[in-house]
Amino acid sequence: MTKPKIFIDADACPVKAEAEQIITRHQLDLVIVSNGGIRPSLNPLVQLIIVAEGPDVADKYIADTAKAGDIVVTGDIPLAAKVISNKVTAIRHNGDIFTTDNIGGQLATRDLMADLRAADPFLVQSNRRGGTTAFSEKDRSRFRNSLEAAIQRIKRGN
């Protein structure tokens, strides 16, 4: 039985508590990676890693540390692309699973939206930015189900 380690890209992550509940039930290690502002957990299974401030420092730590069979929780598409290429499971906060089949399209969409924002300075300043909808209880439930399923799959060796 493989024992995965769970990594959370913690800055702006709304499901840290849910992940901690699940890892406690399974007696797995949880590594929360942040550049600060996160309260340490009293749970001995939870390790808080504070990295230097700067763009993508937490992402680099996670990408360099997570191994095949581990799970990464992130909303960062480039980080997800890096880790899934190393056979790490990547789960979005809302429970969506990043896969080798869907990551290319997500990276392309992300890059296109960045180009559109850069080309329209008024878009950045207006309410037309788009963005995501509010994080819901349904999203939390989907995340819990996805993390639970990923842990079970890895433990079975699939």
Per-range role (PLM):
Residues 2-158:
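Nuclease catalytic cores that cleave nucleic-acid phosphodiester bonds
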